[in-house]
Amino acid sequence: MPEYLILVTPAANRVFGGQAAGLTAAELEICAGPGRAAVSGVVSMAGVDYIAFQASDYAAIAETVAGLSSAHAVFERVDELLRPVELVNTDRFADDLVTIPKYQGKTNEQFTRLLVNVTAASMSRRPPGPISLLDPLAGRGTTLSVGLTLGYDVAGVESDVKAVEAYAAFLKTYLRRKRLKHKASIDPVRREGRSLGRRLQVEVTPEAGGRPQQLTVFTGDTRQSAALFGKRRFDLVVADAPYGVVHGSSAAGRRDRSPAALLTDALPVWAGQLKHGGALGLSWNTYGLTREELTGIATGAGLEPVADGPYLRLGHRVDSAIHRDVFVARRP
């Protein structure tokens, strides 16, 4: 069976870069699906690390490999030589949509794409049309921009009005400079005479053409996400939970550095916004909440956790205060 080697994209963050190959190996195993890629793991050739795998039908997984979060180049191994294999880029937008914004607390872009990829691969039912993604902790839109890049329709909720305004300003400038056909507005939202905050609405057609994609972000409390979106349901819910360092949640009128209080209240709301067969993907700091505790919250919300094999190899160190892991669950 032919053997292939993936060269991992260099990472500006040294700590993440040192762990990226192992994370991408697990990502490939999840995203390729059972029996389509026999992943050997990380191997070294001439002092350079690669992800090694075998595939009898590479063409069947070519788009999956090209879409991995850290795939920089792919080679077919021929004895001691490496033959380059073309990476077919299927992204709908250039990667600078995700990489240009720089701000304190921004989650690593490569990891964000891994989180979205793994969650999407875990759906038990593929939608007949475009995939829809909700980030109920949207921040300044990294996950939403990754979703747009992958061709999804995206939506979010964010309590920080200034973060939404900053994301709106970036999008308007970016789309204008790229000369992409689009409509963008940020407007107040009122229902039954009450102000519910503001809504960012964007419709954009990628440079390559095709169908327009939709982005909607509400300002407000993520616990009210279902009320904000009404009957709308999503194929994916993807969120970067508070790490308890820069982020936090509010409980009983005080700042809570653990994500437990927020997730206990909000996760059942998010679960109800998933379509049947859809998947939820969370990244969180295991120093503030154990996997067992998070599993209990998810099962109590009617979700079915996916916690075996490569799903248990996605944990990694961020810094001395943060050990980040990935939790995935499906709505039956």
Protein language model regions, located:
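Class I S-adenosyl-L-methionine-dependent methyltransferase catalytic core
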Residues: M1-E27, R77-L134, A138-P332
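N-terminal auxiliary segments of SAM/dcSAM-dependent transferases
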Residues: P2-L82
